[in-house]
């Protein structure tokens, strides 16, 4: 997917008291939440907040230092950013009540052009083609995406996927977290309609199985009712919690009302739903096709490797699948439908044989959690995030200890003791916790309500900050 960055304009009304009342670290988190594209090592950006009561300058680079400075008092907001420390891409002075969306639409060209400064040279050619196409063919969709918090967060999330071995899977997880109508519209233009983003080719990981390994008969009417996915092969598509699917026949097709949960980083979740329709191959009962879909023109082909439907607790349907869409040709996986929420152990030998018929090992499948319990209380989610922060601090201390032992003479009297570092780390963590809990009912809650962001979206942007409940 294409990556974008944006210039930042923040009004005094939005950040009243922030610069004067919070630490560098907390202010950085607040700005990063509002503007996730800021924190790039390869770029230096300048934001100025000018008003009668507030004056602060933020320079963000490798050191990420916050400085406060005095400036002439005015009723205007001056905003801009620089790339490579010298070339000014965008700089504008606008009235305080200016509609920011209008400004962003005007600056779309500069926004996408800035992508090149944060992308590796190996990606430059493809990035040039993609950005040129987006500027020419998807200007409106791109502008809407930048102006939408969820879509902008999705783009920020996609940046973390660059050059990873699991880049495509990472991108899909970003889509799971931040999917909404604006994201869909952007993808439809960039991927399907104008094909600005090249399709990922089939690498043969999920080949079409031999017809001889499929079931010889399958009555779709027997598939009526509720089924759990209790085990899945592909962690990207198959291993979500609380996968409860309900099927019925309609006009000769099998219609599935699907639901599943997406975990948020703090241990919470939100629920996704979808409706899919399958037609049975007239000559191969064990093959079901889900084609003719508008979104990304996706097509999923199901191959039923084994099944037993006898109105018993251990009923099951074992499905291997492969698919294609405008973004990816040849994705696939396998999953087990069961009437029970967990895998009946007595059917495992049958599942092992069926998985081996397509070159897979059922022992490597992931058992899903279908208890479908309530969301953990806020206290537990806070504790989980704090524990993760503590583990990170301890890891950093251990790394420091190794460096000190390896070069003790050079460190001399200037290094801090490990216990001092550990104590300061915990104190900083405690300050962050107290601040976010204290401010949850003030500025941050008001901002969240205005943006209508979900807890998972906010947590993704805050990184290691404390989790926040979903706001309805």
UniProtKB/Swiss-Prot annotation:
Changing residue 151 to S has the effect of: Loss of activity
The EC number(s) this enzyme carries: 1.23.5.1
As for subcellular location, the record says: Plastid, Chloroplast thylakoid membrane
Q: Which reaction does it catalyse?
A: all-trans-violaxanthin + 2 L-ascorbate = all-trans-zeaxanthin + 2 L-dehydroascorbate + 2 H2O
- Intrachain disulfide bonds: 133-151, 138-145, 157-174, 161-170, 189-196, 242-372
One Pfam match, given by its short name, reads VDE
Q: How does acidity or alkalinity (pH) affect activity?
A: Optimum pH is 5.0.
* Recorded consequence of changing residue 161 to S: Loss of activity
What are the GO MF terms of this UniProt record? violaxanthin de-epoxidase activity
An example GO biological process term is:
chlorophyll metabolic process
**Posttranslational mods:** Disulfide bonds. Reduction of the disulfides results in loss of a rigid structure, a decrease in thermal stability of 15 degrees Celsius and a loss of activity.
Q: Which residues form a coiled coil?
A: 379-462
* Mutagenesis or variant effect for residue 297 to R: 55% loss of activity. Total loss of activity. Total loss of activity
Annotated phenotype, changing residue 291 to A? 99% loss of activity. Total loss of activity
Give the record's free-text account of how this protein's activity is regulated.
Irreversibly inhibited by DTT and iodoacetamide at pH 5.7 or pH 5.2, but not at pH 7.2. Regulated through Ca(2+) gating of H(+) flux at the CFoH(+) channel. Requires the presence of lipids forming reverse hexagonal structures such as monogalactosyldiacylglyceride (MGDG) or phosphatidylethanolamine. A negative curvature elastic stress in the thylakoid lipid bilayer is required for VDE1 activity.
* Effect listed in the UniProt record for changing residue 245 to A: 55% loss of activity. Total loss of activity
Result for mutant: residue 196 to S: Loss of activity
Q: Which UniProt keywords apply?
A: Chloroplast, Coiled coil, Disulfide bond, Membrane, Oxidoreductase, Plastid, Thylakoid, Transit peptide
Name any GO cellular component annotation.
chloroplast thylakoid membrane
Quote the InterPro entries the UniProt record gives.
Calycin, VDE, VDE_dom
The record's Gene3D superfamilies line, in alphabetical order, gives: 2.40.128.20
Further remarks about this protein from its record: The amount of VDE in vivo is estimated to be 1 molecule per 20-100 electron transport chains.
Function summary: Part of the xanthophyll (or violaxanthin) cycle for controlling the concentration of zeaxanthin in chloroplasts. Catalyzes the two-step mono de-epoxidation reaction. Stereospecific for all-trans xanthophylls. Zeaxanthin induces the dissipation of excitation energy in the chlorophyll of the light-harvesting protein complex of photosystem II.
Q: Which family does it belong to?
A: Belongs to the calycin superfamily. Lipocalin family.
For this entry, the protein name equals Violaxanthin de-epoxidase, chloroplastic
């Amino acid at each position: 997917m294409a990556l974008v960055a944006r210039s930042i304009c923040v009004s005094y009304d939005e950040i009243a008291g922030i610069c004067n009342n919070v630490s560098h670290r907390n202010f950085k988190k607040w700005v990063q939440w509002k503007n996730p594209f800021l924190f790039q090592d390869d770029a230096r950006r300048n934001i100025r907040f000018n008003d009668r009561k507030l004056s602060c300058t933020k320079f963000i680079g490798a050191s990420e230092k916050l400085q406060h400075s005095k400036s002439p008092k005015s009723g205007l907001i001056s905003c801009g950013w620089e790339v490579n420390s010298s070339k000014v891409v965008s700089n504008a002075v606008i009235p305080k009540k200016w509609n920011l969306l209008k400004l962003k639409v005007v600056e779309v060209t500069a926004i996408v052009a800035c992508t090149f400064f944060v992308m590796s040279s190996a990606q430059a050619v493809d990035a040039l083609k993609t950005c040129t196409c987006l500027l020419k063919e998807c200007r409106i969709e791109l502008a809407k995406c930048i102006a939408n918090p969820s879509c902008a967060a999705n783009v920020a999330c996609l940046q973390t996927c660059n050059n990873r071995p699991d880049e495509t899977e990472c991108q899909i997880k970003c889509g799971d977290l931040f999917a909404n109508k604006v994201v869909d519209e952007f993808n439809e233009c960039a991927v399907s309609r104008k094909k600005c983003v090249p399709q990922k080719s089939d690498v043969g990981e999920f080949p079409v199985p031999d017809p001889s390994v499929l079931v010889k008969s399958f009555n779709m009417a027997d598939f009526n009712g509720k089924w759990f996915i209790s085990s899945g092969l592909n962690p990207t598509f198959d291993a979500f919690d609380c996968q409860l699917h309900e099927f019925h026949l309609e006009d000769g097709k099998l219609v599935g009302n699907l639901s599943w949960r997406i975990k948020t980083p703090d241990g919470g979740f939100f629920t996704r739903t979808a409706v899919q329709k399958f037609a049975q191959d007239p000559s191969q009962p064990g093959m079901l096709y889900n084609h003719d879909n508008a979104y990304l023109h996706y097509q999923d082909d199901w191959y039923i490797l084994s099944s037993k439907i006898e109105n018993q607790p251990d009923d099951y349907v074992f499905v291997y699948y492969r698919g294609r869409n405008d973004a990816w040709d040849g994705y696939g996986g396998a999953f087990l439908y069961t009437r029970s929420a967990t895998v009946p152990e007595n059917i495992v030998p049958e599942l092992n044989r069926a998985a081996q018929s397509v070159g897979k090992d059922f022992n490597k499948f992931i058992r899903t959690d279908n208890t479908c319990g309530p969301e953990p209380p806020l206290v537990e989610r806070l504790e989980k995030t704090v524990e993760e922060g503590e583990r990170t601090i301890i890891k950093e201390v251990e790394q420091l200890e190794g460096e000190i032992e390896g070069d003790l003479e050079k460190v001399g009297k200037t290094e801090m003791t490990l216990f001092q570092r550990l104590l300061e780390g915990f104190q900083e963590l405690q300050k962050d916790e107290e601040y976010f809990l204290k401010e949850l009912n003030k500025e941050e809650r008001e901002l969240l309500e205005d943006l209508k962001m979900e807890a998972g979206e906010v947590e993704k942007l805050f990184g290691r900050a404390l989790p926040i409940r979903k706001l309805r």
